[in-house]
Amino acid sequence: MKKLMLICAPVTSRSGYGDHARDLVRAFLKHDKFDIKIWDVNWGQTPRNALDGELDKNIIDCILPEPKMDSRPDVYVDIRIPNEFQTLGKINIGITAGIETTAVSSNWIDNCNKMDLVIVPSEHSKDGFVKALYEKMQQLPNGQQQKVGELKLEKPIEVLFEGTDENVYKPIDNSSLNLVDDIKEDFAFLHVGLWGAGNYGEDRKDIAKLVKIFYESFANKKEQPALILKSNQATFSILDRE
């Protein structure tokens, strides 16, 4: 009998975490070592229609109609940000993209320490967790704070790079791209990312500042490159597009 694995992830979401989750689920299914059940969760307000009824039937068949199990999973895999990690299995694995900066919050470190293993996609992300260090403080009766220890990552963390489907992502004939005719520059930078909420400088990807710095950096260059932004907002709605 196969061991029971419960995967908590936004597998139906059209998002980066959704793509990552689907890649991992397909890999688990291909190895065929576990009886896999999926707890599909939302990812913000992104659409939850990423699965194809025919092509992704093996994934859809694993999705639980309700987030409950008759028995405790042998392995629980949580593919989200660390503050959402739970420990529902006999063995608990947290898989996260981490953070774009070097500052990992104490809340994330605390939750990672509840897992048996943490997996991230890059050495940069791993370094952020490994090097994070916070002082544990205790409130004294006189109102002062006293250091009682340190908070740091104490559980194993491994890097599992995000692979590429070469059937999809491959060199193509530039003549098949209508966009090429609109780009007069010889060199172009491409940025792909969700343009989040907030005013200038508040978007987590900081795309507005990217545009500003791009203009400033190449303003006085004789041969200026192009900047291509492939972006979207969370809800994909007509109102957002307008």
Task: Put a short name on every predicted segment.
Residues V11-R14, V25, V41-T46, I81-F85, ...:
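Short, solvent-exposed loop/turn segments at secondary-structure junctions
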Residues M1-R72, Y215, A226:
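N-terminal pre-catalytic "stem/leader" segment of glycosyltransferase-like enzymes
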Residues L6-C8, Q45-F129:
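Extended catalytic core of nucleotide-activated donor transferases of GT-like folds
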Residues K2-K3, K90, F187, P225:
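Nucleotide donor/acceptor-binding cores
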Residues H20-R22, R26-A27, T164-E242:
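Conserved catalytic-core segment of nucleotide-activated headgroup transferases in glycan assembly
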Residues L117-P171, N178:
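Donor nucleotide-sugar binding/catalytic pocket of nucleotide-sugar-dependent glycosyltransferases
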Residues L6-A9, K37-D40, V77-R80, F161, ...:
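Short beta-strand segments
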